[in-house]
Amino acid sequence: ISGYIDRLPATLRQIGVLSGHLGLEMKDGLLTKLNADVELVDGMLGIPGIDRDAAFETADLVFSYSRPSDSFMVSKAALNFADQRRLSFDGAVTQFHAPSANVKGMIEANNLPIQSLLDGWPDPVAADLKQTLRQRFRGGQFKFVKAEFLGAFVPETSALTLSRLGLESRFSGVRANFASGQYKRLVATIGGALGMNVGKGGQIQDVLVDLEMTDGSMLLDGYERPVDLAYGQVKSIIRGDVATLENLALDMGSAG
């Protein structure tokens, strides 16, 4: 089927063994309309703009393609991977045959290693933020992550450029390094919630952080000995250049 959709990225052509219902129309050797409600087994997923493929065990898909309206729409996509990861998404591509197509959609994942998200992060999207996250965080897993996006896709180069990205997530087991300024050392294992909105050009519009910290250590400038941080909570909202601290609680054991 993918061979008849001439603008479909090569990364989406390894769809696996297919069963279900397909309805299609052909004209002059070209696919003009397609409606599908299918199940795929043992296939490969590749997302445009992300240079990694992932093998999946099963996938339930409901999608449609229309050459007259120049659109490709995914109403449902639910994939299960061998390592218990789950991924679902929906969305639409309009101006499908144009040099630059419009893309809008939502991706939701469970049990996703944070490193895999960083490895697949598109380079043009908030590159400075990606570098900061790599430097300050390691390990851990997203229990839940949801991203809503709007952007443009260039089939010729498989380049995906996002003009809007909204992120919601819950995670655990991340080792974090918050050292900065008077805090010569501030490390802890963190979990909690992180949300953000990123606009055109990778501009971060707002960030919501709601964290719990354990097994931490802090060393202030001018002090010789670090202080253990047994437990901590912090909730903060950042909008533009303004940061609002809504809650901060630290348990330093015998140190206070």
Feature locations, PLM:
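Hydrophobic lipid-interacting interfaces of membrane-associated proteins
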Residues: 1-6, 13-29, 36-101, 106-119, ...
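Short loop/turn motifs that connect adjacent beta-strands in outer-membrane beta-barrel proteins
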Residues: 156-162
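Outer membrane beta-barrel transmembrane domains
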Residues: 126-127
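Short, P/G- and charge-enriched loop/turn segments at secondary-structure junctions
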Residues: 9, 131-135
